[in-house]
Amino acid sequence: MNSSYKSRVFNIISIIMVSMLILSLGAFANNNKAKADSHSKQLEINVKSDKVPQKVKDLAQQQFAGYAKALDKQSNAKTGKYELGEAFKIYKFNGEEDNSYYYPVIKDGKIVYTLTLSPKNKDDLNKSKEDMNYSVKISNFIAKDLDQIKDKNSNITVLTDEKGFYFEEDGKVRLVKATPLPGNVKEKESAKTVSAKLKQELKNTVTPTKVEENEAIQEDQVQYENTLKNFKIREQQFDNSWCAGFSMAALLNATKNTDTYNAHDIMRTLYPEVSEQDLPNCSTFPNQMIEYGKSQGRDIHYQEGVPSYEQVDQLTKDNVGIMILAQSVSQNPNDPHLGHALAVVGNAKINDQEKLIYWNPWDTELSIQDADSSLLHLSFNRDYNWYGSMIGY
């Protein structure tokens, strides 16, 4: 083989290698550009501060995957790869914020749940953010609404008032979750505006789809779940005060394995003389809850406080329904939801910790939270104290 032939072969190989290098660099650049474009199209949520207490971070990172897996099992959904987005806050229009932190839970690229960390018991309400004990809860609260706009290159502020929850974007306020109130309307647009004070204070942003390094040891073991065998969500409370009616109907349908009960019929039975127009304003008193249960062949009794995990476990195994009686911590006498009723669906053990599963009639999905927490942080941004239970449905 002469030297000129060797030279030609060397040149050809050199050209091929340079071409491959150019192609790979181009692909790398395109990949980086695609990643940059994808990152630039991510939603940002406005917050006053992006600082989160370390104990909140650790608790969220340790628990979110197990909670998500347990809630997926309740809806017969396939489990997947769970990730935790950045925590955001919710504000009133005047700038007040609540004492909870909200984490988007991401599964296979979609925001599917919201992990809420809020004060564990009434005593914690008066403690600083760093000193209070936190309860962990998971639900689908505004998760779908966030998922729909997660890839939008925009900034929103999450707001709340007595009518529900809103997203504010470019000065426009949109209702995303309405409060169940007699006469309430699910208006899409609101004339409300963010206060100038709050606008000035919103100096930071968080990204709901940004996954941070998990510094805490993540645990996702669901060792045990026990629920009322035939429990189904068939209806949802909105423009009325029938929380106990919805809860009793759901529990009786479950324990009797039927679908004949509904909130309207129960309230009509309790208030036979009231017009249809006025019926949405009627609420239910403890003696009515007991008497209605007895009329359906159930021996109902009132028990003060939160039932123990062991009691819930046994009653659920025995196909006995428990209704939660809760009272708003704010104690506002003009509050149409000063009292609230919910249905206990069962219990679970996640990462060796005891949890309760319940249904809030305002929601279309179940919620899971710590069994030793007497505070319920419910759908429209208020804390309720679980003060008693009606047992026997």
Swiss-Prot record:
Subcellular location per the Swiss-Prot or TrEMBL entry: Secreted
Record site feature (Cleavage), residues: E219, D220
Enzyme type, top EC level: hydrolase
GO cellular component, one term: extracellular region
Catalytic residue positions: C243, H340, N360
Pfam hit, one: Staphopain_pro
Gene3D superfamilies: Cysteine proteinases, Staphopain proregion domain
Keywords recorded for this protein, A-Z: Hydrolase, Protease, Secreted, Signal, Thiol protease, Virulence, Zymogen
Major subcellular site: secreted
The keyword Protease is assigned to this record: yes
Documented activity regulation: Prematurely activated/folded staphopain B is inhibited by staphostatin B (SspC), which is probably required to protect staphylococcal cytoplasmic proteins from degradation by SspB.
Gene Ontology terms for molecular function: cysteine-type peptidase activity
Domain of life: Bacteria
Further remark: The cascade of activation of extracellular proteases proceeds from the metalloprotease aureolysin (aur), through SspA to SspB.
Subunit structure: In the cytoplasm, prematurely activated/folded SspB forms a stable non-covalent complex with SspC.
Function, as annotated: Cysteine protease that plays an important role in the inhibition of host innate immune response. Degrades host elastin, fibrogen, fibronectin and kininogen. Blocks phagocytosis of opsonised S.aureus by neutrophils and monocytes by inducing their death in a proteolytic activity-dependent manner. Decreases surface expression of the 'don't eat me' signal CD31 on neutrophils. Cleaves host galectin-3/LGALS3, thereby inhibiting the neutrophil-activating ability of the lectin.
Protein name (record): Staphopain B
Natural source organism: Staphylococcus aureus (strain N315)
